[in-house]
Regions:
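Short beta-strand/loop segments at the ligand-binding rim of alpha/beta enzyme cores
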Residues: 47-52, 100-105, 221-231, 269-284, ...
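Glycine-enriched alpha-helix->loop->beta-strand junction motifs that scaffold or abut catalytic
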Residues: 70-75, 245-251, 273-276, 294-298, ...
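Short beta->alpha transition motifs characteristic of CBS
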Residues: 78-83, 126, 130, 138-153, ...
Length: 362
């Protein structure tokens, strides 16, 4: 777009600051480090226990790191340099980790042989399985301990002969504490979850409960599963929908320059099509924030501040990160939209400076 502004006037730029340009001014405080509350919203509906996200880079975040990030209270954002099918598997891998009620339960039939069930459990990596009929009614439970004697003398015997038919079950509203008490009282390691008709709906295991107790500060969704984010391109609506259906909590519109009207239009369309929160980025100015805060669940800030990012070198475009965060936060805070500072964080102090400038997470 043509401008009547003289070229020389364009050089009269306002001051803009980055991390090395500022320090926090010390002030009086009674807050001890271990008493600090670091919980923060990273999007409209997702709260973290620490304000830290991992980068959506193919050398950084896949399901393993995303799982550990959520266990520590943060958020892992899966990169998009993979097929949609691989992405779905990665999301599901995070969601399965540490879940209290296992939904994808490995089950046995009473008419299978002991050898068949032993092979199945070895293949699926489980040490026991509920025994159900064709209607998923729980008839019993079978474990490696039940099977072991039969493998020596009667591996063709049926599961109904080897299973434990006195099954301790629980309903959907069971708490981790209640499930643990059931296991302790009855000396068992797994409790099938059933509906009012005794149909199997899930399974709680001792290992799952202990894993959850180990990570008591983990960031979880309303079902108790670990939270996970997924990066998608601005024109990848199909990938965004697949991520949403797989259970992703946040879809990140991943673009080097999100202050592009086509990007904003497609981001708005994606937001209308998915149930997950949608975070839009990256932007670096007040004007960009004004274009997206009316629909975005979060805004990601950073035009080339990263140590290996070449955006500023290649395009000659960018904004010093402290000023960029502050400008975007001025707008986003008026709409209760969280701000994420993306890039340029070299030291822990830089993260603190970004938060002081208005970021909710880094």
């Amino acid at each position: 777009m043509a401008s009547d502004e003289p070229f020389s006037e364009k050089l009269r730029v306002p001051e803009a600051l980055t991390f090395d340009d500022v320090l926090l001014r010390p002030k009086e405080s009674r807050v001890e480090p271990d008493a600090a509350d670091m919980t923060t919203r990273v999007s409209t509906n997702v709260t973290l226990n620490i304000p830290v996200l991992s980068a959506a880079m193919d050398t950084v975040t896949e399901s393993e790191l995303a799982t550990e990030m959520a266990r520590q209270g943060g958020l892992g954002v899966l990169h998009r340099n993979m097929t949609v099918e691989q992405m779905v598997e990665e999301v599901e891998e995070v969601k399965r980790a540490d879940e209290l009620i296992i939904r994808d339960v490995v089950t046995a039939s009473p008419d299978q042989t002991v050898r068949e069930v032993d092979t199945m459990m070895e293949r699926e990596g489980v040490s026991g399985a509920p025994v159900v009929d064709d209607d998923d009614t729980v008839l019993g439970i079978i474990s490696g301990t039940d099977i072991r004697p039969y493998l020596e003398v009667g591996e063709s015997d049926l599961v109904r002969e080897a299973m434990t038919d006195e099954v301790i079950t629980a309903h959907e509203d069971v708490t981790p504490r209640q499930a643990l008490e059931l296991m302790y009282e009855h000396k068992i390691e797994r409790v099938p979850i059933v509906d009012e008709d005794d149909h199997l709906t899930g399974l709680v295991t001792m290992a799952g409960i202990l894993a959850r107790r180990e990570y008591d500060s983990a960031a979880r969704d309303e079902d108790g599963s670990l939270v996970v984010g997924v990066a998608v391109g601005p024109f990848e609506a199909d990938r965004a929908q697949a991520a949403d259906e797989a259970g992703a909590d946040i879809v990140f519109i991943d673009c080097a320059h999100a202050h592009n009207l086509d990007v904003i239009d497609t981001a708005r369309e994606i937001k209308a099509e998915v149930d997950a929160d949608v975070v839009v980025g990256n932007v670096g100015t007040r004007e960009a924030a004004e274009e997206i805060v009316d629909f975005a669940d979060g805004v990601k800030v950073g035009i080339g501040p990263g140590s290996i990012c070449t955006t500023r070198i290649v395009s000659g475009s960018g904004m010093p990160q402290i000023t960029a965060v502050a400008e975007v936060a001025d707008v986003a805070s008026q709409h209760d939209v969280p701000v994420i500072a993306d890039g340029g964080i070299r030291y822990s102090g830089d993260a603190i400076k970004a938060i002081a400038a208005g970021a909710d997470a880094v």
